[in-house]
């Protein structure tokens, strides 16, 4: 990528790496990512540079330039030392690291977190969240051993290069959901409409693709029905997702006769956030699956269409995926 860009007073003539973030700390860090199919190179003007280090080793200038060649399989740290003593850091990430990276602010410091978990920062703490996975790993730059994990067990911390690596887990919470075929869907029709009546589909023939369900439950010929019961969540789990693996044109989920979620088949599970409902004990739902017509005249990704079996439509499996939240912080100073 030919460009002339100022990096804290140093001229970057060109680079084959992609800019990501600037961590505006006392010693700023410019974060870039390497592309797997491209040799990673950066060329700096030597004008204001006294010394360049890459991964702890000095780099020699070539005339009036510094040429840095970096492998794409690991991260690299480049330290630029100016003639006036000012330092600038460049952190080069792999593509996978960049994909899982988060820039967050803690106090007056910018941090880089690399994790497959969701990161929810606040001024007081950082929350990391996993769905259906009770094991966590965080890589934090700059490295700092003072990070403390709340509620975590089996906490292991170590320094790896420029990162502080923290691994921990929380107790797994097994949750069982019951699902049975419903032979009498008429019993789920609400006595009074919960929502204004939806008659858009009144004249739609069953052979047409697309949704054939309603905001207020009404049985639809050829549909498959399942009674689903979700248990009360324990105190340690604040939320959970209902994961419905099915085959069919559409899926529709009802609670007390009202449509609460729908899904067009795409090859993956239908997900429903149970936290959307007021939880007072267990929850009962009716799941409606409308099968595909014999001719599926809609676009599906080739990999999905290849696996589509019209002879076995309906629910394949249904489970509860708990949401695990863990908070961790670092003492000030």
Predicted feature locations:
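Non-catalytic C-terminal accessory domains or segments of carbohydrate-active enzymes
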Residues: 1-333
